């Protein structure tokens, strides 16, 4: 919440914030709610991970789902290949924007 306060104090015309994790975004949403900042009216908010906290906060948090289960599966496969001295290819994991109320009318 302190980071959100500092950001908004330094940049009062901010109209959107993308947080690197849902837990940080939820803290930011709490700060904005406590200080009368309208979400998404004044500021749109997006988190990252699509955790359960994204659905539980108010308003519900728009989040980027980074497909964590697939990331874990690929990581294990890569480690096993490395252990057996086999080449490892780069992998791209698709992400999905899960739109919820914190960006309503903005995206």
Language-model regions: role of each:
Residues 2:
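ATP/NTP phosphate-donor binding region
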Residues 5-6, 10-107:
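Flexible loop/turn connectors
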